Amino acid sequence: GTTCYCGKTIGIYWFGKYSCPTNRGYTGSCPYFLGICCYPVD
């Protein structure tokens, strides 16, 4: 995946999604260009 930032927190960018995949252990997210940024990086 592509990296992205929620403030200073690095995450993975999911294009076209508006919620994070539930099976990857993400603890947070923020809206990102045409999608969502989910962290922490797995």
Curated annotation (Swiss-Prot):
A Pfam family it matches: Defensin_4
Primary location group: secreted
Disulfide bonds: C4-C37, C6-C30, C20-C38
Keyword Secreted (UniProt): yes
Gene Ontology CC, one term: extracellular region
Superkingdom of the organism of origin: Eukaryota
Keywords on record: Disulfide bond, Ion channel impairing toxin, Nematocyst, Neurotoxin, Potassium channel impairing toxin, Secreted, Toxin, Voltage-gated potassium channel impairing toxin, Voltage-gated sodium channel impairing toxin
GO terms assigned for molecular function: ion channel inhibitor activity; potassium channel regulator activity; sodium channel regulator activity; toxin activity
Subcellular location: Secreted; Nematocyst
Role of this protein: Inhibits voltage-gated potassium and sodium channels. It potently inhibits human Kv10.1/KCNH1/EAG1 (IC(50)=1.1 uM) and Kv1.4/KCNA4, and moderately inhibits rat Kv1.3/KCNA3, human Kv1.5/KCNA5 and human Kv2.1/KCNB1. Likely to act as a gating-modifier toxin that binds to closed Kv10.1 channels and reduces their activation by shifting their voltage-dependence in the positive direction and suppressing their current amplitudes elicited by strong depolarizing pulses. On sodium channels, it blocks rat Nav1.4/SCN4A, human Nav1.5/SCN5A and displays relatively weak inhibition of mouse Nav1.6/SCN8A.
Domain notes: Has the CSbeta/beta fold, which comprises anti-parallel beta-sheets stabilized by three or four disulfide bonds.
Note: Negative results: does not block human Kv11.1/KCNH2/ERG1, Xenopus laevis Kv11.1/KCNH2/ERG1 and human Kv1.1/KCNA1.
Family: Belongs to the sea anemone type 3 (BDS) potassium channel toxin family.
Protein name: Kappa-actitoxin-Ael2e
Taxonomic lineage: Eukaryota, Metazoa, Cnidaria, Anthozoa, Hexacorallia
